[in-house]
Amino acid sequence: MGNQIDAVVVSTPDHNHAPISLMAMGMNKNVYCQKPLTQYVSEAREMDKVAKERNLVTQMGIQVHSFYDYVLATELIRQGIVGKVKKVIAWSPKVWGYDGPEPEGSDPVPAHLDWDLWQGNAKKRPYKEGFYHPDNWRKIVDYGNGTLGDMGVHIFDTPYNALELGVPLTIKNNCRKPNGYGHPEKNEVTYVFPGTKYTAKKLTWIWYDGEGAPKLQKDLKLPNDEKLPEQGAMFIGEKGKRLLLPHFMELPRLIVKGKYENIDIDKYDPQGKLGEPVKDYDAESNKHYHQFVDACLGKDECSAPFSYASKLTEVIVLGTIAAQFPGKKLHWDGQNGRFKEEEANRFLSV
């Protein structure tokens, strides 16, 4: 049957992304893998390496990457609508964490579920109704990447792409102490990235998640005391201009001297190459899915291949690793893929 398959779609919990994708790529199959690409940094780098070596078509399932509002925001930032960017703040109030103890005992495994297969290479534990399958696995360290791995990937994507960032220099997560089981219910992660041509020297990036996120501050104050979008990102320029990008399917908003300022889209996209605003989620999502199919047919190129997705995923996973050392600044050696703090390196691979 293998010679009848051209591509594989991986839509499992995070911990099984890499084993399945690597097996498929080892058989020279093109792969569409859901976000985040992997659970561990070592896996992300290996998937990028194999995809390049075998010249495969790959795409990470961050469909919002292809949405008009995100494509527009990328173009606006790169054309300097707020000048050089000195800070990014991103947030989501979702709570894909669990601060309680690991449950005791076990429950009968549903007839439709192969629990051993579902657990894959992860630590083996008894099935417990309501804690893992079908939804809550995101909260558990062995299976998911918390809110960072769910919403963080989507919301990080546009600022990360627009500013052409690489991997961070330092990461610090202010959260509760690790409990060895669940991700924190609230995270406040500060990254510092090397500068690019779109940033003002080094870039500070702050992520907030959990109930009540984000922390109120001057950089997030909106005109007329308007309420912040529930989820989104703010680009802060070095001269005070700001660009708000709600998540999602809302156009970016420019803030100058405490007031909204109209964005002349024709100025930034005179030939209309970016397309038109669309208010249909399925239609917008289909662009990303179909792009992968067209790339497999040799008609297009993927905009979120593993060469890009692996780096974005690495940033996300570094934030979850920092949760193991609350309040401590970790120093990342991106070239060698290791922390200066030796005790953190054990979290880089299975």
Predicted feature residues:
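Alpha-helix C-terminal capping/helix-to-coil transition sites in glycosyltransferase folds
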Residues: 2-4
